[in-house]
């Protein structure tokens, strides 16, 4: 055991704010299931200004980091290499430390989104809608670039956000049309709707959900279910939640950081559900 502990066995999630993060619950559940009793997974409040110093202070015991806002772009200059997936959206949520000391960045949000959708039977769609703009919305576009064969409509609040989303569409090879947020209820005509906005933002839209809608992917996990997700399910639609995304992206992180595959998806999901239920 002593020789194992001398190797890479530490990981953590960084961000600001970070107290609410479920990542420690998910990763620790994976370690327990995999028999990695000597592995540790922590949580650190780190903002953009503090990130370089934090990274510089890490030693050879560290296997990897999970990153949340506002660090997903700030970390990129501090890395030795970045995966094509992360580079495509200029966002890194996973850092893996190799045996030779290199720091490689990846984005598991995008394949995590795809895995969560496929788990609910969504393999390909003719069109899709995205509610909101920003880092999560750009990841949604990257995921849609692989499963949407038609147009994506993004509902946003400003001309600047509209231009940003169209720019991401061009970069990712997705046909993106933008519409004003005041018309967001029209999104529900699409077979797949991805809601990427903060808690409460879509509550007023719940009354507009039609009977037998398609699939809603609401990236929030707390509070859950959201008002929109509740209405969607009540009207016969399929719902994919933020915990689904969180678990699937964490599975990929565990596999990269520990070198063990497959990670215990169901044990991690159960731990996440229990943690949310106790809050």
Can you name each region flagged by the protein language model?
Residues 2-120, 223:
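Phosphate/diphosphate ligand-binding glycine-rich loop within oxidoreductases
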Residues 74, 159-165, 204, 224-227:
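Short, charged/polar "capping" segments at the starts of alpha-helices
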Residues 4-5, 122-124, 146-148, 207-214:
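Short, conserved loop/helix-junction motifs that constitute active-site signature segments
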Residues 170-240:
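Rossmann-like adenosine-cofactor binding region
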Residues 15, 107-110, 117-146, 156-157:
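Glycine-rich adenosine-cofactor-binding loop
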Residues 149-172:
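NAD(P)-binding Rossmann-fold cofactor-contacting core
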Residues 219-279:
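Adenosine-phosphate binding glycine-rich loop
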């Amino acid at each position: 055991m002593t020789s194992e502990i001398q190797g890479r066995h530490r990981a953590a999630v960084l961000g600001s704010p970070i107290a609410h993060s479920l990542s420690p619950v998910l990763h620790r559940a994976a370690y327990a299931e995999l028999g990695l009793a000597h592995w540790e997974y922590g949580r650190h409040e780190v903002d953009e200004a503090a990130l370089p110093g934090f990274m510089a202070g890490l030693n050879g015991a560290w296997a990897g980091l999970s990153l949340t806002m506002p660090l997903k772009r700030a970390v990129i200059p501090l890395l030795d290499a970045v995966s094509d997936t992360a580079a495509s959206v200029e966002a890194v949520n996973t850092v893996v430390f190799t045996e030779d000391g290199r720091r490689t960045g990846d984005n598991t949000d995008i394949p995590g989104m795809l895995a969560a959708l496929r788990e609910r039977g969504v393999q390909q769609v003719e069109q899709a809608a995205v509610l909101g703009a920003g880092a999560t919305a750009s990841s949604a576009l990257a995921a849609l670039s692989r499963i949407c064969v038609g147009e994506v409509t993004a509902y946003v609040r400003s001309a600047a956000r509209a231009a940003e989303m169209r720019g991401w569409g061009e970069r990712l090879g997705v046909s993106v049309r933008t519409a004003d947020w005041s018309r967001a209820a029209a999104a529900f005509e699409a077979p797949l709707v991805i809601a990427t906005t903060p808690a409460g933002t879509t509550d007023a839209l719940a009354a507009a959900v039609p009977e037998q809608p398609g699939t809603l992917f609401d990236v929030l996990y707390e509070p859950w279910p959201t008002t929109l997700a509740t209405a969607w399910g009540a009207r016969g639609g399929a719902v994919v939640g933020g915990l689904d995304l969180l678990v699937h992206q964490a599975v990929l992180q565990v596999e990269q950081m520990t070198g063990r595959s497959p990670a215990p998806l169901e044990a991690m999901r159960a731990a996440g559900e229990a943690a949310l239920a106790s809050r």
